[in-house]
């Protein structure tokens, strides 16, 4: 009975918060660059057959390539440091015990012990440096193509790498490296045409983020792979550790879900067997628009949201990628110093993607387990700040393309996360109807690069 009453109270709380948030609709394109003149990629502009597909050079897509979460936890047990080894921490930083996240491992000094204990945690590492009260924050990510446009694939890959820094409220990146694998199945012509476009997309996104690509590694491999490393040295007040959520906080999401569904559905347009399973719930035009919406969202940096985390006193955050919103919420909940749990009530989803997920019997979108690529930030904000954050991020002064929704609350609990049985689905309408029809400059040499 007590549990039911608590659930009811949570529902009322969410209704009030959503009412305070105001408009739930999308608000345009990405900051720094406009996608309004984007023209859908056509392989013919590169001298390829109309049936040419970038995604044919890999067997998996985007962040869907991640090792399943439970399997990953077991594999990473091998990184646990033996008790006799010296600790990774360097003592106290700013009068507080420093939390170190090493390659997705959270390290905190164990109770009653001089040595840190290890647990699976977040994606960035935060390493206190020996001098000057500075910390090294570093992250790496790579994946396989999930869109057909090589230039946009490069942008998405870079945005995805930077997102781990942004999830910690870091807005500046000192350096990036690019990791690139060129498919050995490609012809020489394909390599010469496609590879420079992917590199240009990656570089342009890095420059939009105020950083530069200074090196990396390029190899030949059966599948195309693209990603990189992002590094920054910063003071403690420049980042927000993801461990300070408190009861009463509100969960805010800054990009809609459904990117992986949209990417797969777009490929199913050429696969009659799979298309027949979903054609009763979605039209070809709706799939094309959803795919374009997903692509633009994935290519949008989370940098503005990272800056606003400081303005509105965020307590913790993570980015939503390969483990879906539920998996990443659970990871974030495990990091919390306080005894709290996250409860998700609302799921902003690209229009029609929930219907496709149901009709296909795949993805688990409504269950929160569908992989996302270069997804939004899930941020724990003080309740009184959440609606203001959602309003502020849509301001034209940050450029176009940013949006946010209140999706859940932080309750007293045991560091877990869950989605309620019947979450409210917020259908996010694609913004690309006019963009798809707009005339774009000649892209025969630059593929479908967005305009500046």
From Swiss-Prot:
Keyword check for Kinase: yes
Q: Where does Mg(2+) bind?
A: 123, 164, 319
Q: Where is the active site?
A: 63
Q: What is its EC number?
A: 2.7.9.3
| Positions with biased composition (Low complexity) | 95-105
Biological process according to GO: selenium compound metabolic process; selenocysteine biosynthetic process
Which positions does UniProt annotate for ATP binding?
A: 66, 121-123, 141, 164, 215-218
Report the SUPFAM superfamilies cross-referenced here: PurM C-terminal domain-like, PurM N-terminal domain-like
GO molecular-function term, one example from the UniProt record: selenide, water dikinase activity
What residues correspond to the site Important for catalytic activity? 66
Q: How is the cofactor bound?
A: Binds 1 Mg(2+) ion per subunit.
Q: Could you tell me which residues belong to the region Disordered?
A: 86-111
- UniProt cross-references to InterPro entries, sorted A to Z: PurM-like_C_dom, PurM-like_C_sf, PurM-like_N, PurM-like_N_sf, SPS/SelD
Residues recorded with modification N-acetylalanine: 2
Q: Which reaction does it catalyse?
A: hydrogenselenide + ATP + H2O = selenophosphate + AMP + phosphate + 2 H(+)
List of residues that carry Phosphoserine: 49
Coiled-coil regions, chain positions: none
Q: How is it modified after translation?
A: Truncated SEPHS2 proteins produced by failed UGA/Sec decoding are ubiquitinated by the CRL2(KLHDC3) complex, which recognizes the glycine (Gly) at the C-terminus of truncated SEPHS2 proteins.
Required co-factor? Mg(2+)
Does this entry carry the keyword GTP-binding?
Answer: no
Q: Which UniProt keywords apply?
A: Acetylation, ATP-binding, Kinase, Magnesium, Metal-binding, Nucleotide-binding, Phosphoprotein, Selenium, Selenocysteine, Transferase, Ubl conjugation
Its assembly, as annotated, is: Homodimer.
Question: Which family is this protein grouped under?
Answer: Belongs to the selenophosphate synthase 1 family. Class I subfamily.
Free-text function comment from the UniProt entry: Synthesizes selenophosphate from selenide and ATP.
- Please identify the protein, giving its name as recorded: Selenide, water dikinase 2
């Amino acid at each position: 009975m007590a549990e039911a009453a608590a659930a009811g109270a949570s529902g009322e709380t969410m209704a009030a918060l959503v009412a305070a948030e105001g408009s739930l609709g999308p608000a345009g394109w990405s900051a720094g660059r406009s996608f309004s003149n984007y023209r859908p990629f056509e392989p013919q502009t590169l001298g390829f057959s109309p049936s040419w597909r970038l995604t044919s050079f890999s067997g998996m897509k985007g962040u869907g390539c991640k090792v399943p979460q439970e399997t990953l936890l077991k594999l990473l047990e091998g990184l646990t440091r033996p008790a006799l080894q010296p600790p990774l921490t360097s003592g106290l930083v700013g009068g507080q015990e420093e939390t170190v996240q090493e390659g997705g491992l959270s390290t905190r000094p164990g109770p009653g012990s001089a040595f840190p204990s290890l647990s699976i945690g977040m994606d960035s590492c935060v390493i206190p440096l020996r001098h000057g009260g500075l910390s090294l924050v570093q992250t790496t990510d790579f994946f396989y193509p999930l869109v057909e446009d090589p230039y946009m694939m490069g942008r998405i890959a870079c945005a995805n790498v930077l997102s781990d820094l942004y999830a910690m409220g870091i807005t500046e990146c000192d350096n990036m490296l690019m990791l690139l694998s060129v498919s050995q199945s490609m012809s020489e012509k394909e390599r010469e045409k496609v590879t420079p476009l992917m590199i240009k997309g990656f570089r342009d996104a890095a420059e939009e983020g105020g950083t530069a690509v200074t090196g990396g590694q390029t190899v030949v491999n059966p599948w195309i792979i693209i990603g990189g490393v992002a590094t920054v040295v910063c003071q403690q007040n420049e980042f927000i550790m993801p461990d300070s959520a408190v009861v009463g906080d509100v969960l805010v999401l800054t990009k809609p879900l459904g990117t992986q569904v949209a990417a797969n559905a777009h490929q199913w347009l050429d696969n009659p067997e799979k298309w027949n399973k979903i054609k009763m719930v979605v039209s070809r035009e709706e799939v094309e628009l959803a795919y374009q919406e997903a692509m633009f969202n994935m290519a949008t940096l989370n940098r503005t949201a990272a800056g606003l985390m400081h303005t509105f006193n965020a307590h913790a955050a993570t980015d939503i990628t390969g483990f879906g919103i539920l998996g990443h919420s659970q990871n974030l909940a495990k990091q919390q110093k306080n005894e709290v749990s996250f409860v998700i009530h609302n799921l902003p989803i690209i229009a029609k993607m929930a219907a496709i997920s149901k009709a296909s019997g795949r993805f688990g979108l409504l269950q929160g387990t569908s992989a996302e690529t270069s997804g939004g930030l899930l941020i724990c904000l003080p309740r009184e700040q959440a609606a203001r954050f959602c309003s502020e991020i849509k301001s034209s002064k940050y450029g176009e393309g940013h949006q946010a929704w209140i999706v859940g609350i932080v309750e007293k609990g045991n560091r877990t996360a869950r989605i309620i049985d019947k979450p409210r689905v917020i259908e996010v309408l694609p913004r690309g109807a006019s963009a798809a029809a707009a005339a774009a400059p000649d892209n025969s040499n630059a593929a479908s690069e967005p305009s500046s």
